[in-house]
Amino acid sequence: MLGFLKNFLDDNAREVKKLQRVVTAVNELEPRIEKLTDAELQAKTPALRERLEAGAPLDDLLPEAFAVVREVSRRVLDMRHFDVQIMGGVVLHQGKIAEMKTGEGKTLVATLPAYLNALTGRGVHIVTVNDYLAKRDSEWMGHIYRFLGLSTGLIVHGLDARQRQASYAADVIYGTNNEFGFDYLRDNMAMYPRDLVQRDLYYAIVDEVDSILIDEARTPLIISGQSGKPTDTYYTMARLVPKLKAETHFAVDEKARTVSLTEEGFARCEELLNIDNLSDPEHEEVLHHLNQALKAHALMKRDRDYVVKDGQVIIVDEFTGRLMFGRRYSDGLHQAIEAKEGVKIERESQTLATITFQNYFRMYEKLAGMTGTADTEAEEFKKIYGLDVVVVPTHKPMIREDLPDAVFKTEEGKFRAVVEEIAARHATGQPVLVGTISIEKSEVLSRMLTRRGIPHQVLNAKYHEKEAEIVAQAGRIGAVTIATNMAGRGTDIMLGGNPSFLALQEMRRRDYPPEVIAEAAEYGPCTEEVAEARRVYRELYAEFKKETDAEHDRVVALGGLFIIGTERHEARRIDNQLRGRCGRQGDPGATQFFVALNDDLLRLFGGDNIAGLMDRLKMDEDAPLEHPLISKSLETAQRRVENRNFSIRKHVLNYDDVINQQRELIYRQRRQVLCGEDLRPVVRQMMEEVAGQAVTAFAPEGVYPEEWNYEGLSEYMTQILPGEKWTVEDLEERLGKKRDDFRREDLRRLFLNEMEQAYAAREAELGAETMREIERVLMLRIVDEKWMDHLDAMDQLREGVGLRAYGQKDPLVEYKFESFDMFQNMIASIQEETVKKLFRVRVVPPQQAERRQVKENLYAAGGDGVKQPVRRDKKVGRNSPCPCGSGKKYKKCCAAKDEQAAG
């Protein structure tokens, strides 16, 4: 690992030198480009496209294209790309990951490679983490693209198929990772070619790439339908589990996040449930419910893993601390938590289509990403995605000071020291941001600060609605902010305050309508009322800018923002994200982590050395400890967890790659059926396969004809073919010979001829046009149904295959063999079902309204999750946080537009 790190640093320095040469080439063009008129600048797009069509590679067009975008940005947005932003743009164009620190202007960087690659006409996808950022960036950066004659699209929640098609047809498309993934799945469930929305997956630029490709790597997007399973058993198990004793009846492994019944526990549960043998296959479902109830009670903690809000169990994102509205744990775990908390249980769902972010984004021809923290995961990006990480230098030197960890014997002593440190800094007026890893810890600290009389703000999943407001104020004089996991918070902390936010706050005070305020700081087309609001906003912004600039200088004199981490996260990257909240754009700042020897990280992964050290040290709880062993143990523990998590993700990917290959094959064949004009050759091939498989099953090669199963073949032909029942005598009559003289080829040809005659008769009865439509719809429905069943079967295989290790077999190899057999059986089942139903299907007049409703329902559906959760979109409450991610209440954000669209 250390060798990899050294090589990475050396390679990065060499890479930056190469990038500097490209920056020089762009800068040399700047004086000439600056002299161009607007019309001459706009003429650059068709000129560059002509060069591209003439065979010039994109790399040759890069210097001029980048210089053009830089100049247009300066004219329309008054923002000129810095040299380091040009570097970042080159890295993204090369299909790599650009690590750029917070505040370095990643949004503007993306315009450079997006413009260059959009010249191909194939569409560039810019992927953000929520609807709010996608909408903001598409409108804001859209000025650059529109000036240059390119169109922009927006893919967010709530659009119908026609709106999505229009957006995907654009040159540059902004959207969220969830929506891009769901559209891929929905396209592969479409019943008509006109319902397809996505073009081919050409080039994606992923913002916060570490969050999407690592933190959510194991998160599948799932489109689901409700299953018919009853919910009573969950309540039964929720009442049973509290009667069990930890260690006596079940064992909890916090490190592996597992819980299992002991022998004594099995006996106790059998007694309580009045079951003879809980391990018996007939009680498999009961045992599954029991295990999920144990997980819900012993592993899942309220206000850490989830919160209960408005009678619902809502997952808390372990990486960002945000509430994950609409996401649900799969496999019955969410229902088990609902039963534990005594809220209404929602039914389990059945998977209709699924894909992980890992596999979705690996389908792009070219993939690139941006983030503030990627270098610690460079090895994983390279091994799993084939993506190199380049650390781009900052525009101004980084002068933030990262202080050594303060280590305490106990958590209580640590929190007392944190409060003292906050009090001392607050007394001088220096703003302080405190990062905690759970809602529970943030509220403990908040109570301690309240007792000390220190005014402060709390930002955690419970106070999501105030998020933007709290973050915007965190850099002001005397501000104290407690935040659960600042990763991905999306709003810059500006020293002295954010003038844009203050201007909008003043407009709220003046009673401007919420929908007008929402548009005041935007850039898109608008009404006269909004145009007037934008004029007022600009005036207020200029006024507050003077105030915040003066306050900025005072905060700088105090040392900038001081950040306290109250616990080390499992991943160094998340710690670095917290640190990265200060020291933006050359501002001063300092960070320090306060750590206790009984924090989860050290307790679970620190090893026996820490336990022994705790016993040996007879020190005051409130005194910080400094010991080289502790610092080393911290780093070792984090590396150990990172390596473990990487291994888990790699292991999961090995299994997921198996089903991914099957998915690609089935979706490719499905698309051929969907878009095929004449499916007769496909049906003919299916009939040949059905005949061949039947003969193989009932008249196996190498077996004497007198031993063949003629009765079985006759019954099977009766199932497939319309009309009379087939008997062995019919076979003899049609072939003109006795059964002992049959050859396998005779039987195959007879069966195939009978199917072809039935097919021809069916087409003559219905007409060629109707027959083609029936073939297409029937095949698509059968493929979808069989694929759905196959996904369920693969899930069950994956759950049980690990036990093969006890038999000295490699579970992955066994999984590959069995899944291949299952896939072959599914294909055979699709062929058989299609042929059989084609001869029997009844034709009814098309129900246009129903068909349209099904399509609309599909676009309202969707899902993704944590580990394997399922999202099912529901009606959003007017006082709930807006699903777009803006942090505002739904009624004050997107409600009016949604109601207008619905009406």
From Swiss-Prot:
Keywords: ATP-binding, Cell membrane, Cytoplasm, Membrane, Metal-binding, Nucleotide-binding, Protein transport, Translocase, Translocation, Transport, Zinc. One of its GO terms (biological process) is protein transport by the Sec complex. Residues 863-890 are annotated as: Disordered. This is Protein translocase subunit SecA. ATP binds at Q85, G103, E104, G105, K106, T107, D492. It is found in: Cell membrane; Cytoplasm. Zn(2+) binds at C882, C884, C893, C894. The keyword Ligase does not apply. InterPro entries: Helicase_ATP-bd (IPR014001), P-loop_NTPase (IPR027417), SEC_C_motif (IPR004027), SecA (IPR000185), SecA_CS (IPR020937), SecA_DEAD (IPR011115), SecA_motor_DEAD (IPR014018), SecA_preprotein_X-link_dom (IPR011130). Its cofactor is Zn(2+). It comes from Desulforudis audaxviator (strain MP104C). It catalyses: ATP + H2O + cellular proteinSide 1 = ADP + phosphate + cellular proteinSide 2. May bind 1 zinc ion per subunit. Part of the Sec protein translocase complex. Interacts with the SecYEG preprotein conducting channel. Has a central role in coupling the hydrolysis of ATP to the transfer of proteins into and across the cell membrane, serving as an ATP-driven molecular motor driving the stepwise translocation of polypeptide chains across the membrane. It comes from the Bacteria. Its EC number is 7.4.2.8.
